Amino acid sequence: MNMISLKDDLRGNSYPGRGIIIGRTPDGTKAVAAYFIMGRSENSRNRVFVEDGEGIRTQAFDPARLTDPSLIIYAPVRVLGNKTIVTNGDQTDTIYEGMDKQMTFEQSLRSREFEPDSPNYTPRISGIMHVKGCTDCDVQEKGHYNYAMSILKSSNGNPDSCCRYTFAYENPAAGEGHFIHTYMHDGNPLPSFEGEPKRVETMDDIDAFTSLLWENLNEDNRVSLFVRYITIATGAYETRIVNKNQ
């Protein structure tokens, strides 16, 4: 699979919806995660990301303007031990609870389907990062890192069928990541993402990567962005959050 330009891909798509990027920095030392949300309606745009423990949650920027909290208020990021979960809905909690009971990522999602927002039937996209630092391994090692991504979507808009796809990446290559988003592009109804997660570039500098993403998301539709870099050897992390509403 050819690597695509994140800048060009984002700039050329006014509405990819919600998106997850997971990968590894070019120097190989850090795991990379990013999650963004976009909105077309006032209800969807009336949101911000806020920190919540080691993760984040969405909340209404102006509570008085919140008309329907379902599907838009949730925890996109939660941390379970050395696992970081990133999703576009409350399946974050489903994965967290399942893996806490020794279920796999894929098994945990078996109880979930795409969102019930007819006629779009928005896909549920999810990612899991497993960063095993040197506190868990031989002192000579620099830690282990792998990740997986999932999409649950309707069968070409048919709500009677759910298509389940999981993509696993072991010992991911330095300098690249994978990008999955809910919609192919704007439309009515919105067309679900198709194919494998896109192979994209990463950057060593978290601020530069955050700027690359935010500046190339459609200015009218972008709402919030979360970026996290995790040092693979130690598990230490740093986070950036950008909200359009301030």
Predicted regions span which residues?
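Conserved short alpha-helical segments that host acidic/polar catalytic motifs at enzyme active sites
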Residues: 1-246
